[in-house]
């Protein structure tokens, strides 16, 4: 009996934790005027890099996460060297030096709605990518 109960709890825990692990949302077409992302990167005097996200036609709205979608609003996802680092809910982010392990490092930003749906233009993800050289 104990072994049966253990397996039921174990497999349900594994299944349920993986069910929501990656928020595999849909793709949603952005509304016109389309969002534009400009990113400014500056070396931090102590360690790492400071990123500033200048967004046009897109509103960061952490107060609405998992509540409702509004046109061209939500959050950003930050990838460094193709590794998801964080969700971004404000215009500024400090990226520690440990994420910049290569001579040429790739930074990518993608836009998502409050329900974790990827924003697109003509079914292509809205993203901005550039390189940071050490």
Predicted feature residues:
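Short beta-strand elements bearing conserved aromatic residues within extracellular beta-rich modules
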Residues: 76-78
